[in-house]
Structure formats: structure tokens, C-alpha cells
Amino acid sequence: MLKKTLAALALGSALFTAGQAMAADYKIDKEGQHAFIEFRIKHLGYSWLYGRFNDFDGSFTFDEKNPSADKVKVTINTNSVDTNHAERDKHLRSGDFLNVGKNPTATFESTEVKANGDSADITGNLTLNGVTKPVTIKAKLLGQGNDPWGGYRAGFEGSATLKLKDFGIKMDLGPASQEVELLLSVEGIRQ
């Protein structure tokens, strides 16, 4: 009897573990403040100016054993740009930068994921300011597992660098401020 019980427990554990590693779809948990899309740009070459987008939605497919099957899709409300300075945010929403009246959303949709040791390169099409260009996000799995509410989560961080002029942003901020760095932290809830 004990052998059968131990065998059943071992089989159940193996199936449970295998189930955790299989491909799954995740919804980005922005409601619990477990996801952030932030950016930084040099200010005159002396310091960093940080900002974020407060309103976005997204999902991803994660298959730890087959990263090439992974997918990411995110939509950002560009009007939600926030640098903690109302006048600057108003200027960022204008035609000089994001032109939110004409381009109320920015989107990213992956086209390829390549594993690179303990990280991955997520390449996809970013549409920002009405311009679509390929962008590669350097991403890393931070962790995954069961949450206290009966769900399963996976968390990642990532970064990418964008040239403002590539996305039709012609405002000249000086030689030190031609690029903006995206800083991403995402926690997804398995669906």
C-alpha cells in the first residue's frame, strides 16, 4: 500500500511539474501594479529624466522549453505618459513628440524570440507616433510559480533603446538626448 501511495505521489508531482513548464498564455497584471513600462532619456547629458506610461494592456505566450514559440503583444495609451511634470507631459503629448491626438496608442507585437543563455532577445514591430519599426527587447525571466490566490504567474524584465528620429520625433533635444531607453517589468497571470 505504501509503495502504491508513494508511486502515485511521484507521478502526481511529475505531472504537476511538467504542467508548470508547458506553454501557456498570460495576461499582464497591470491591475495589481505588477507591471511597468518606463523610459529614461538623458537631460543635457548631465542626468536622467525618467517617465512611464500608466495605461497599457498586454499578453504573452511563454514556453520555457520552446522559446521560439513565445509571443508578446502590448498596447499602450500614449496619452498616459507621465514624467511627474504636468507641463512637460503636455509637451510630450503634442505633435513635437507622441502626437497623441493623431496616434492615441503605441503597439508592440513580437515576430521572433531567441533564447540567449538565461535571457532572450524578443524582436518585434513597435508602432510609435504612427511609425512602425523593428525593435529588439533584451529580456530575462525573473521567476515563475503559484501565487497565494490559486493562480500561476511569470515575471520578466527587459530593456530596449530607441532612436527618437526613427519614430518621426524630430524635436532636437541636443546630442546627448537622441535615444530613449525603455525599461520594462512585467508580471503575467496564466490564463
UniProtKB/Swiss-Prot annotation:
Cystine pairings recorded for this chain: none
Q: Which domain of life is it from?
A: Bacteria
Q: Which SMART domains match?
A: YceI
GO cellular component assignments: periplasmic space
A Pfam family of this chain: YceI
Q: Which residues form a coiled coil?
A: none
Location within or outside the cell? Periplasm
Q: Which InterPro entries match?
A: Lipid/polyisoprenoid-bd_YceI, TTHA0802/YceI-like_sf, UPF0312/YceI
- Which residue positions does the secretion signal occupy? 1-23
| Swiss-Prot/TrEMBL keywords | Periplasm, Signal
* NCBIfam families recorded: PRK03757.1
Q: Which family does it belong to?
A: Belongs to the UPF0312 family. Type 1 subfamily.
- Name of the protein in its database record: UPF0312 protein PSPA7_0523
